[in-house]
């Protein structure tokens, strides 16, 4: 049996200056393109956490907030807006969020590191297409668990069906096509460096700290990977004594 602890952190190959520039540019570009060109997918990505939000929540942490696209789907009260924290690791994208949504809190930071919030501070934690990117995934999930309210909090996650037939084919005519047209080079080095974690790995790590209380599959509402593009998960924090090593 493989020791799971030896899988992490996963190592990413270093980037040249040109590759780093392309990586930063495409991440921002794709966050702009996806809502416009592939709205039917983006609707699932962002409606799922809204539909399964805890009742009467106040404080939200969104990790890997991108350009703030998820906020277009929220219907927040004035107080909920003030208590909404968008965490984004790229400063240029964080600046874009703050410009569009000046009334929320925007923090530049890495969800794999300790966050500047007390234990159990948030009623909801959201991660939309984030966990597949993380080389230190267990640490990020443990930190989401730490800041999530253990009594009433929920963790909402959306991940791609990475490796499935449907997802691979869909990517060839969407992100891969855009990337190769824009930069005139192979998409492979970019996506192999970005999508590090498969669904089964992510779910295994989530279940160490959380209990899955709902699953949603898109576009076919059947619990199968090969025919779907995305999975939505709603999770409740386990009691400290219930967590697995």
Identify the role of each PLM range.
Residues 57-66:
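Conserved class I S-adenosyl-L-methionine
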């Amino acid at each position: 049996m493989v020791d799971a602890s030896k899988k992490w952190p996963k190592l990413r190959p270093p980037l040249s200056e040109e590759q780093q520039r392309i990586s930063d540019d495409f991440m921002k570009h794709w966050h702009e393109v996806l809502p416009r060109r592939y709205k039917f997918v983006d609707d699932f990505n962002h409606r799922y956490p809204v539909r399964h939000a805890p009742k009467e929540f106040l404080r939200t942490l969104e990790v890997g907030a991108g350009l703030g696209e998820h906020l277009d789907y929220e219907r927040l009260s004035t107080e909920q807006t003030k208590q909404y924290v968008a965490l984004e690791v790229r400063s240029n994208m964080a600046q874009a969020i703050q410009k569009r949504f000046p009334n929320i809190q925007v923090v530049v930071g890495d969800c794999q590191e300790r966050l500047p919030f007390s234990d159990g501070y948030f009623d909801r934690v959201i991660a939309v297409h984030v966990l597949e990117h993380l080389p230190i995934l267990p640490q990020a999930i443990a930190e989401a668990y730490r800041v999530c309210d253990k009594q009433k909090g929920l963790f909402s996650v959306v991940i791609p069906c990475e490796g499935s037939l449907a997802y691979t084919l869909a990517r060839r005519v969407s992100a891969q096509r855009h990337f190769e047209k824009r930069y005139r080079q192979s998409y492979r080095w970019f996506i192999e460096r970005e999508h590090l974690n498969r669904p089964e790995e992510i779910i295994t790590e989530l279940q160490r700290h959380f209990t899955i209380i709902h699953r949603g599959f898109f576009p076919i509402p059947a619990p199968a990977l090969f025919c779907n593009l995305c999975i939505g998960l709603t999770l409740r924090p386990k009691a400290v004594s219930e967590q697995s090593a």
